[in-house]
Amino acid sequence: MQVRIIAVGKIKERFLSEGIAEYTKRLSPYLKLSIVEIPEEHRGTRAPAGQEELAKEKEGGRILAAIPERAYVVALDLRGTEISSIELAARMHDWQLAGTNTIAFVIGGDLGLSDAVINRAAFRLSLSPLTFTHPMARLILVEQLYRACRINSGEPYHK
């Protein structure tokens, strides 16, 4: 199975980059992971709401262009469904049994995801009711993917 994480913005904090690199390495026996970083749309510090919406739409267009054809799309969204690690593992297993070869997880920038991206998603996932920075959400996602792979392989994992 292939997993593509499509995220707006670059990781600036070294500790997050190192954590993501570590889990990417750990995931390699289980799946092929690629991460695509979409440039943030530049806007003024006090941009009017209309300009922010336009920026979100432009980012959304770049996200949609990065989604592989026929990929199962999961949008990380505060209004999405909260699931446990075991439920994520079960869903990934089910998606694979249904013939899904590629899963695309999308993470928006500070403006969130455009309506077009949300509408393209087959599933909306909330990592937590807590608020995370988008780079932190990326680290949590790759850790949870690793945990799901361990669960599906019948290997021990921290509970």
UniProtKB/Swiss-Prot annotation:
GO terms for cellular component: cytoplasm. It holds the Pfam family SPOUT_MTase. It catalyses: pseudouridine(1915) in 23S rRNA + S-adenosyl-L-methionine = N(3)-methylpseudouridine(1915) in 23S rRNA + S-adenosyl-L-homocysteine + H(+). Its EC number is 2.1.1.177. It comes from the Archaea. GO terms for molecular function: rRNA (pseudouridine-N3-)-methyltransferase activity. It is found in: Cytoplasm. Belongs to the RNA methyltransferase RlmH family. This is Putative ribosomal RNA large subunit methyltransferase H. It comes from Methanoregula boonei (strain DSM 21154 / JCM 14090 / 6A8).
